[in-house]
């Protein structure tokens, strides 16, 4: 089920029922360009809706870039969990190389009412991707297992899997795009698999050209997408329909 809405996200989100979204995965405006659409959303009003819509253990996954990242994290320290780094394949900022490093990353900021540590009473939904089974399970000290890693080893004290995700994600930059800030489909699919399960509902309240919606459809998730610009909305609608 996909529900696509052409309108102002701060108004349209008011119509979404409380606790109805398993995850919110979105690429909001960073306010770092001169583009008309690149204006930072009123974060206080945004959080008023997101905190109401998200489920108690759901993840809110927002892409960002400095200085917007700092502003975003500071806007809701209570729910902030951690940041991921998306390392791109192409750097930007060549004209400034004599004054500062080229930029080759963006941030992905994770928020939730749920916890993200051993012993959390309400753990945030999280499915680590890319795990590999160890040919020979590793024996863990019983004391260290009970104290720190009881969630990744069996009661017998053996760790059976490895290759747990790190905080830097490497996905190639998008080649030909239909939106200036379009994210790689593979990156969005990775985030969806990490923070949701099949059949669950994802909200993208500034969906742009609809990449998150395409990823959600590919992976059997339900999707709610909101986009203000009518031209990008039509592009998103066509891309999701064709997926």
What is each model feature region?
Residues 2-224, 231-234:
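Core catalytic lobe of class I
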Residues 237-243:
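Short, conserved SAM-binding/catalytic segment
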